[in-house]
C-alpha cells in the first residue's frame, strides 16, 4: 500500500484516474476467489490443505498489478496520441495489464505457482492424467500400437459472449462478470481478438494466454460427452451378466441422445483413442482401421458444426498412416519404442479391472528440435554450443539463471514421458552453460573463472530439481456429463509449449 501511495503522490493531477485500478483489484480478488476456491481448488495430495486463503490471492494479484504498473508508469510520453487513451492511460498497456491479470487469475487453480505451498508433501504421480487440451489420454500415455492419426484443422472464431459464459459457471459475483464482459468488448473495439491466418483464426499474441485458456476450457466442457460414450461402449459386446443393468442404463441414454447422435453412436467401439487439441489442430490417434478413422472424422466435424458452428476448410482434414512408431506432434517428431509390460489396469472409471499384457510406449524426444528452439531463443548455437545472449547480459545474474532454469524446466516438461532422459539432460546442460556464459560476460570474466568463483551450486538446480506438475481434481462434474466424469488434470502450459515447439 505504501508503494501505491508514493505513486499516487507522484501523479496527483490524475488521482481520479488512478483510483480505478485500485477498485479494479477488488473485482479481481472476487473473481479469483469464486473461480479458484469455490469450484475446484482441491488437491489430491496427502497433508495439503483443501482451502486457500483469499488473502494469499489478494497478495498475488496485488504484487502483479504493482509490478506492471511501476514498470510502465513513466513509459508514456507526449508522443502518445490522445485518441488511444483509456482512463488517462495508453490502451495498449492498460488492456495488456488487465488481460495479464485475468489470465493469471483464471490459471490459479491450474498453475504451478502454488507448488511452493506443497513442498515436503507427497504429490500424485502423473499416471493417466488428462489435460485441459484433451478429454482423452495423452499420446505419451501407455497405449497399444496405433495405426492411424487424424489431423483436423478447424477454424475457431470465438464470440465474446461465449467466453463470458465460460466463466459464468465459476463467478458468483455479478459485478465481476459484468466487468469482465466490459473489458472483453472494449478490447474488441480496440483490437480484434482473433486475426485471420491461413484460412483459420488464431488469437493475437497479446491476448492468446487468456483466450486460449477460455477456448480450451469451453471446448473441454462440451467434449465430456466423449468420455461417457467411450466408457460405456467399450464393453457393450460383453456377455457377462454383471454388467447387464449397466448396459440397460446405457441403451436408455442412447435413446435420449438419439436425436443428436443417430448414425454415429456405433462408432464408439474402439477404446484405444487418443485425442488432443493444440495450436488450432485436433489430433486423434487410434488403433482402428481407415474406415473407422473416416467415421471419426465425420463425427468430429459434425460435432464442431453442431455445437460451435464451425465449418472446416477443404483439404484441412488428413488421415495419416503411422509408420516406424513416429508421429509429428507439437512441433517435433515424437518417436516411441515398445516395451512389454504386464499391467492390471482400469482404462476408465466405471469400467472393470483387466489383467492383460500391453506394450508400453516410451516417448523419445530428439535433441535436434530442442537445440533448434534454444538456438531461436539465442541461448545456444545451431551446433549445440552455449552462447551468451546480449539481452541476458544486461540483466541480473539471478534473472539470467532464472530464465535458463525456466527453459530447462520447459524442456523437461516436454520430455517428461521419456524413458531415457538423455535428450532432456543435454538440453538442460546447454541452458545451464548459456546461463553461465551470460553471467560471465556480464562480469567480464571467463566461464571457467566464474564457475570456480561460485562453485557448482549455480548448476545444481538444473539437474536436481524434481518434476513439478500441479495436480488437482474436479470435485464438481461437468454439466454435460452428469456425475460420471471426474478426472485428475494436468494443465499444459500453453506459453512454454509454444516456445518449445518454435511455433510461429
Curated annotation (Swiss-Prot):
Domain of life: Eukaryota
Main location: plastid
Similarity comment: family membership: Belongs to the intron maturase 2 family. MatK subfamily.
Species for this entry: Chimaphila umbellata
The protein's name in its UniProt record: Maturase K
InterPro entries documented for this protein: Maturase_MatK (IPR002866), Maturase_MatK_N (IPR024942)
One cellular component (GO) term of this entry: chloroplast
The keyword Chloroplast is annotated on this UniProt entry: yes
Keywords annotated in UniProt: Chloroplast, mRNA processing, Plastid, RNA-binding, tRNA processing
A Gene Ontology BP annotation from the UniProt entry: RNA splicing
Function: Usually encoded in the trnK tRNA gene intron. Probably assists in splicing its own and other chloroplast group II introns.
Compartments it resides in: Plastid, Chloroplast
A molecular-function term among this protein's GO annotations: RNA binding
Amino acid at each position: 500500500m505504501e508503494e501505491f501511495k508514493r505513486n499516487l503522490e507522484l501523479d496527483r493531477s490524475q488521482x481520479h484516474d488512478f483510483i480505478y485500478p485500485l477498485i479494479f483489484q477488488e473485482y479481481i480478488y472476487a473473481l479469483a476467489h469464486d473461480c479458484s476456491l469455490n469450484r475446484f481448488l482441491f488437491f489430491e495430495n496427502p497433508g495439503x490443505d483443501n482451502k486457500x486463503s483469499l488473502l494469499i490471492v489478494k497478495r498475488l494479484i496485488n504484487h502483479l498489478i504493482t509490478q506492471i504498473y511501476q514498470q510502465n508508469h513513466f513509459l508514456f510520453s507526449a508522443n502518445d496520441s490522445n485518441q488511444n487513451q483509456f482512463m488517462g492511460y495508453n490502451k495498449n498497456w492498460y488492456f495488456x495489464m488487465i488481460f495479464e491479470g485475468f489470465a493469471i487469475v483464471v490459471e490459479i487453480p491450474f498453475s504451478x505457482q502454488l507448488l511452493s505451498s506443497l513442498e515436503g508433501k507427497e504429490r500424485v504421480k502423473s499416471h493417466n492424467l488428462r489435460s485441459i487440451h484433451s478429454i482423452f489420454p495423452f499420446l505419451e500415455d501407455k497405449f497399444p500400437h496405433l495405426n492411424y492419426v487424424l489431423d483436423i484443422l478447424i477454424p475457431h472464431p470465438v464470440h465474446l459472449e461465449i467466453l463470458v459464459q465460460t466463466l459464468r459457471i465459476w463467478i458468483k459475483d455479478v459485478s465481476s462478470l459484468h466487468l469482465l464482459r466490459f473489458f472483453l468488448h472494449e478490447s474488441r473495439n480496440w483490437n480484434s481478438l482473433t486475426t485471420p491466418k491461413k484460412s483459420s483464426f488464431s488469437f493475437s499474441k497479446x491476448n492468446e494466454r487468456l483466450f486460449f485458456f477460455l477456448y480450451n476450457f469451453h471446448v473441454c466442457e462440451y467434449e465430456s460427452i466423449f468420455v461417457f460414450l467411450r466408457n460405456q461402449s467399450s464393453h457393450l459386446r460383453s456377455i457377462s451378466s454383471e454388467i447387464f443393468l449397466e448396459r440397460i442404463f446405457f441403451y436408455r441414454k442412447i435413446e435420449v441422445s438419439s436425436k443428436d447422435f443417430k448414425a454415429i453412436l456405433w462408432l464408439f467401439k474402439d477404446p484405444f483413442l487418443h485425442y488432443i487439441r493444440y495450436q488450432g489442430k485436433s489430433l486423434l490417434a487410434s488403433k482402428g482401421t481407415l474406415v473407422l478413422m473416416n467415421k471419426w472424422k465425420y463425427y468430429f466435424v459434425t460435432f464442431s458444426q453442431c455445437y460451435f458452428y464451425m465449418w472446416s476448410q477443404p483439404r484441412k482434414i488428413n488421415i495419416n498412416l503411422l509408420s516406424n512408431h513416429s508421429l509429428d506432434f507439437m512441433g517435433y517428431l515424437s518417436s516411441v519404442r515398445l516395451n512389454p509390460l504386464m499391467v492390471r489396469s482400469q482404462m476408465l472409471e466405471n469400467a472393470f479391472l483387466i489383467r492383460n499384457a500391453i506394450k508400453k510406449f516410451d516417448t523419445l524426444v530428439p535433441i535436434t528440435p530442442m537445440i533448434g528452439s534454444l538456438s531461436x531463443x539465442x541461448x545456444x548455437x545451431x551446433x549445440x554450443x552455449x552462447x551468451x545472449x546480449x539481452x541476458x547480459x544486461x540483466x541480473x545474474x539471478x534473472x539470467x539463471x532464472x530464465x535458463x532454469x525456466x527453459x530447462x524446466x520447459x524442456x523437461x516438461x516436454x520430455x517428461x514421458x521419456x524413458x531415457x532422459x538423455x535428450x532432456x539432460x543435454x538440453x538442460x546442460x546447454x541452458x545451464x552453460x548459456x546461463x553461465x556464459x551470460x553471467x560471465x560476460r556480464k562480469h567480464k570474466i571467463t566461464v571457467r573463472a566464474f564457475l570456480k568463483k561460485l562453485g557448482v551450486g549455480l548448476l545444481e538446480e538444473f539437474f536436481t530439481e524434481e518434476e513439478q506438475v500441479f495436480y488437482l481434481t474436479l470435485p464438481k462434474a461437468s454439466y454435460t456429463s452428469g456425475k460420471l466424469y471426474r478426472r485428475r488434470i494436468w494443465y499444459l502450459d500453453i506459453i512454454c509449449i509454444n516456445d518449445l515447439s518454435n511455433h510461429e
